[in-house]
Amino acid sequence: MRVVILGSGVVGVASAWYLNQAGHEVTVIDREPGAALETSAANAGQISPGYAAPWAAPGVPLKAIKWMFQRHAPLAVRLDGTQFQLKWMWQMLRNCDTSHYMENKGRMVRLAEYSRDCLKVLRAETNIQYEGRQGGTLQLFRTEQQYENATRDIAVLEDAGVPYQLLESSRLAEVEPALAEVAHKLTGGLQLPNDETGDCQLFTQNLARMAEQAGVKFHFNTPVDQLLCDGEQIYGVKCGDEVIKADAYVMAFGSYSTAMLKGIVDIPVYPLKGYSLTIPIAQEDGAPVSTILDETYKIAITRFDNRIRVGGMAEIVGFNTELLQPRRETLEMVVRDLYPRGGHVEQATFWTGLRPMTPDGTPVVGRTRFKNLWLNTGHGTLGWTMACGSSQLLSDLLSGRTPAIPYEDLSVARYSRGFTPSRPGHLHGAHS
């Protein structure tokens, strides 16, 4: 079957790889000159299935009000003037109760665990290199309340069979030796030994090269104008004067998926702006061994070979990609506070990206009401964590095979009742 994939981020390229391996003739289209040059370029570097959790959580509405008055708040909201943003935020608020949180986190962990397993198989089969490490993740708590709240997430981990260690502050250095210098600032941590790390951009670009060698065609520097449809079928992708045709089409445009599907399929995917710093390592014994997640500031600090990646924060501000100095100051503050000798912060590269988020935190994966239009988008801050699993799942569904995990609740159909986002018309040209 001929398949066109829209988007060459980690999700689009992983989709291309798995569909190619299933025997399909695959073409990838992207406006950028190469793979992984937007949201997949400089994310936090964590592959953390156990920490897969929605931003929509109990207590978040009250915290959001408090964060409005804090300099280093992990979440910020600025109205963009669209009804779509308001409806999206309302649906997110409706997911902030305990029952929705547990349901959403449960399916996110399910997909993320499966994705890590798929990555392991891919790594074993191809020996793909991406500065990957398998040292686990350590979530750090600064208050006793955070330490006590960890029991809620532990229940989900136990249900999913995810190994963990709940550590007091005196034991944090057993996992991350450099934290011995700052343990007095912390109340403890939750360690997930099976989590991994790696450079998402390096992985995506190397996988794209492997996919191209295997027969996948990449059309870079090719802005997409619109999808062409007739009845319940998509019959082409209009790119300037050219129409690219296939038997099936996969939407993996990330945050731009919603606008590109305008008038065809409504999906509740909204950009969640995040930031990162990439820092050269200064002192080896002062740098992280693997990756940590600061629960207070929602910031991850991840070790690559000779670099430290510091990433996090969430801004609900539309498609704004301005690099804001206060956000850089927050990232610098956290990494200096936890790893004061770790990196040359003054030499850091500052970056921002738009993570495609659904109100419940779970991606939309599967077929739409159009027989040949498929979705693999809306992974939020977990695109790197979920890419291989959601792409293997998509390949299985499109190929008529039975997937290895339950998948019905990943479909966009879960939004068919009670939430139909208005189409963001002024964003229509965002990808073209």
Curated annotation (Swiss-Prot):
InterPro entries: DadA (IPR023080), FAD-dep_OxRdtase (IPR006076), FAD/NAD-bd_sf (IPR036188). FAD binds at residues 3-17. Keywords: FAD, Flavoprotein, Oxidoreductase. Pathway: Amino-acid degradation; D-alanine degradation; NH(3) and pyruvate from D-alanine: step 1/1. GO terms for molecular function: D-amino-acid dehydrogenase activity. Its EC number is 1.4.99.-. It comes from the Bacteria. It is an enzyme of class 1 (oxidoreductase). HAMAP family: DadA. Belongs to the DadA oxidoreductase family. This is D-amino acid dehydrogenase. It comes from Escherichia coli O127:H6 (strain E2348/69 / EPEC). The gene is dadA.
